[in-house]
Regions:
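Short active-site oxyanion
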Residues: 1, 30-33, 70-72, 108-112
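Short, well-structured N-terminal submotif of metal-dependent ribonuclease cores
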Residues: 1-38, 50-62, 129, 139-141
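Alpha-helix capping/helix-boundary segments
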Residues: 9-10, 39, 80, 100, ...
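Short beta-strand scaffold positions
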Residues: 5, 34-35, 75, 95-98, ...
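Acidic, PIN/NYN-like endoribonuclease modules and their adjacent C-terminal/linker elements
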Residues: 2, 40, 105-141
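Acidic catalytic patch
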Residues: 62, 69-91, 98-101
């Protein structure tokens, strides 16, 4: 099965916080990892912000780059941009959330969508994705 990671899920891979083990488990089980092209910039900027200094930033970025090299990147082309508007309008999402979902929507099913953004979960479920998140129970109430 394919695992699609949004930025919130990718960040959990590098930070010791709730959700880290869930992400690690899915990445060990599934050989195909995908993410939108936007995720790279978002993750690197976020890792820069949380790093305690330049040494930790370099270590985090290095680990991320190793992972990024094995991630199948979904481009944010015209088709994806147009689909993100539809998804954003239908589910009242911010553009960044809609872009991640539109990128995932281009991939063959079945797929597991990893996110820790509670705004994305209802849309992901409606799009037919299996969702893995510690937020899933909250979103389904």
């Amino acid at each position: 099965m394919t695992v699609v990671l949004d930025t919130s899920a990718l960040l959990k891979r590098y930070l010791s916080e709730p959700g880290h083990d869930l992400v690690s488990q899915h990445l060990k089980q599934d050989p195909v990892w995908c993410a939108s092209a936007l995720a790279r910039s978002e993750v690197q900027l976020s890792l820069h912000r949380v790093a305690s200094g330049p040494v930790e930033q370099r270590e985090l970025w290095s680990t991320f780059r190793e992972d990024w090299d094995r991630i199948a990147v979904v481009p944010l082309d015209e088709r994806c941009l147009a689909r993100s508007v539809e998804i954003g309008a239908n589910f009242r999402l911010q553009i960044v959330d809609a872009l991640h979902l539109a990128a995932a929507d281009r991939l063959p099913r079945p797929l597991t969508y990893l996110t820790f953004d509670s705004h994305q979960i209802p849309a992901a479920l409606s799009l037919g994705f299996e969702v893995a998140s510690t937020e899933s129970a909250v979103a389904l109430l």
